[in-house]
């Protein structure tokens, strides 16, 4: 059976930590930022963890499962 290909768009968006959590960037921070408050933009710069409902789907795209 051939190896499973990694989805390249998912590989650029997600990263798996050593403990198995999946890290992602926030959306809504590159366009129409003039309307948004400073503290909102600062919060959007931080990384976020993928929810447990989406974890298996992302792992499959990354070829880890």
UniProtKB/Swiss-Prot annotation:
What SUPFAM superfamilies does this protein's entry cite?
L35p-like
Please provide, in alphabetical order, the Gene Ontology terms of the cellular component aspect for this entry.
Answer: cytosolic large ribosomal subunit
> Tell me, what's a Pfam family for it?
Ribosomal_L35p
Question: What GO annotations for molecular function exist for this entry?
Answer: structural constituent of ribosome
Q: Which UniProt keywords apply?
A: Ribonucleoprotein, Ribosomal protein
Question: Could you confirm whether the keyword Heme appears in this record?
Answer: no
A GO biological-process term: translation
Query: What InterPro entries would the database entry show?
Result: Ribosomal_bL35 (IPR001706), Ribosomal_bL35-like (IPR021137), Ribosomal_bL35_CS (IPR018265), Ribosomal_bL35_sf (IPR037229)
Classify the source by domain of life.
Bacteria
Sequence similarity: Belongs to the bacterial ribosomal protein bL35 family.
Q: Which PANTHER family does the record match to this protein?
A: 54S RIBOSOMAL PROTEIN BL35M, LARGE RIBOSOMAL SUBUNIT PROTEIN BL35M
Question: Any idea what this protein is called?
Answer: Large ribosomal subunit protein bL35
């Amino acid at each position: 059976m051939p190896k499973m290909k990694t989805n390249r768009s998912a590989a650029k968006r997600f990263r798996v930590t050593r403990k198995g959590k999946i890290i992602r960037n926030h959306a809504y921070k590159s366009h129409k930022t003039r309307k948004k408050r400073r503290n909102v933009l600062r919060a959007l710069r931080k990384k976020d963890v993928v929810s447990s409902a989406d974890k298996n789907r992302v792992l499959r795209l990354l070829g880890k499962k």
